[in-house]
């Protein structure tokens, strides 16, 4: 079946693409990571940082002078390349950064026990910001709108990659984030506007469902750990021409891939740089103007916006 082109400018209001009057395709000066300096010893983990959005998120935290960066990916060669680029970036700005890597399968619980051990041994158990960026667009049979034609293993892999891994990350790493030495107490889950979609010929059902579950999980974590100071935010990174997007999406949808890959990283740093409990448990878009968003703070909290609920 031919895939129709998608025009996000005509998206329904409930998708929230234009929740702020101003939107961006590149980081604005107001959220430039290089204008941020994190406290001494600040430690960040980016799960799924071998390429694309995750790689650029890690670079944003280096620009913001985070001293400790841990990056993970399934592919060791990708991690080696990103590690070198992060270290070079730090040298260019005259700062010291410790970059650690871990080859892991984000869908396996044992990967997170190894990550926890790495943090315990190498960083005294400190974890300020956790970014869960593992995920990927479906391939193969999952693009069919007919569920009976999908492959079971492909379906399960898609759900595990886009959602279940976030549960493992929270289960094993949140205890570290609640320790006194971990000051940031921030989790950013990279989701997708695809969580709004139901048309299987535009977004595969497994991907939409996985990201929708991630959004709800973000809300649950944010509410259940609010009294312990944890801030959890789901972020749609924009639509960028990443290797993953170009490799999984049909060519007819490539027209929407116009957002800068560094935009999401800048927003992640904006979330982390100060306590933003007013957006905890909520969904935001990296394309939104963060000043506009902050101006809506009272409205968002009072009306409990940017959360999923049934319209009745």
UniProtKB/Swiss-Prot annotation:
Biochemical pathway: Pigment biosynthesis; Secondary metabolite biosynthesis
Active-site residues per Swiss-Prot or TrEMBL entry: 207 (proton donor), 211 (lowers pka of active site tyr)
Enzyme class: oxidoreductase
Residues bound to NADP(+): 46-47, 171, 207, 211, 242
Top-rank taxon, per record: Eukaryota
Record's note on what induces expression: Expression is significantly up-regulated at the end of late growth phase, in the presence of Butyrolactone I. Expression is positively regulated by the pgm cluster-specific transcription factor pgmR.
EC number: 1.1.1.-
CDD domains named in the record: SDR_c
GO molecular function, one term: oxidoreductase activity, acting on the CH-OH group of donors, NAD or NADP as acceptor
Disruption phenotype annotation: Only abolishes the production of pleosporalin A but not of the 2 other final products.
UniProt keyword list: NADP, Oxidoreductase
Function: Short chain dehydrogenase; part of the gene cluster that mediates the biosynthesis of pleosporalin A, ascomycone A, as well as a third cryptic naphthoquinone derived pigment, all responsible for the coloration of conidia. Essential for the production of pleosporalin A, but not the 2 other final products. The pathway begins with the biosynthesis of the cyclized heptaketide 3-acetonyl-1,6,8-trihydroxy-2-naphthaldehyde by the NR-PKS pgmA.
Family statement drawn from the similarity comment of this UniProt entry: Belongs to the short-chain dehydrogenases/reductases (SDR) family.
Protein name (database record): Short chain dehydrogenase pgmD
Organism: Aspergillus terreus (strain NIH 2624 / FGSC A1156)
Top-level taxonomy: Eukaryota, Fungi, Dikarya, Ascomycota, Pezizomycotina
Name of the coding gene: pgmD
């Amino acid at each position: 079946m031919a895939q129709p082109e998608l025009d996000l400018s005509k998206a329904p209001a409930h998708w929230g693409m234009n929740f702020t009057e101003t939107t961006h395709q590149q980081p604005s000066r107001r959220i430039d990571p290089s204008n941020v300096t994190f406290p001494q010893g600040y430690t960040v983990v980016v799960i799924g940082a071998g390429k694309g959005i995750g790689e650029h998120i890690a670079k944003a935290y280096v620009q913001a002078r985070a001293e400790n960066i841990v990056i993970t990916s399934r592919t060791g060669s990708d991690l080696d390349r990103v590690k070198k680029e992060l270290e070079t970036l730090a040298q260019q700005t005259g700062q010291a950064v410790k970059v650690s890597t871990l080859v892991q399968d984000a869908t396996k619980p044992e990967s997170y026990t190894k990550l926890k051990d790495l943090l315990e041994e190498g960083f005294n158990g400190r974890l300020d910001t956790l970014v869960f960026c593992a995920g990927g667009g479906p391939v193969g049979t999952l693009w069919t709108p007919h569920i009976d034609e999908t492959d079971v293993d492909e379906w399960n892999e898609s759900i595990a990659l886009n959602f279940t891994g976030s549960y493992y990350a929270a289960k094993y790493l949140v205890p570290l984030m609640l320790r006194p030495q971990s000051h940031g107490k921030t989790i950013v889950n990279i989701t997708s506007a695809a969580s709004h979609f139901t048309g299987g010929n535009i977004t595969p059902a497994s991907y939409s469902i996985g990201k929708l579950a991630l959004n709800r999980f973000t809300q649950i974590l944010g509410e259940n750990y609010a009294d312990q100071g944890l801030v959890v935010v789901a972020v749609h990174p924009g639509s960028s021409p990443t290797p993953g997007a170009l490799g999984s999406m049909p060519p007819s949808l490539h027209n929407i891939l116009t957002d800068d890959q560094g935009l999401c990283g800048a927003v992640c740093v904006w979330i982390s740089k100060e306590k933003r409990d007013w957006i905890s448990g909520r969904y935001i878009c990296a394309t939104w103007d963060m000043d506009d968003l902050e101006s809506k703070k009272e409205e968002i909290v009072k009306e409990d916006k940017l959360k999923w609920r049934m319209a009745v």
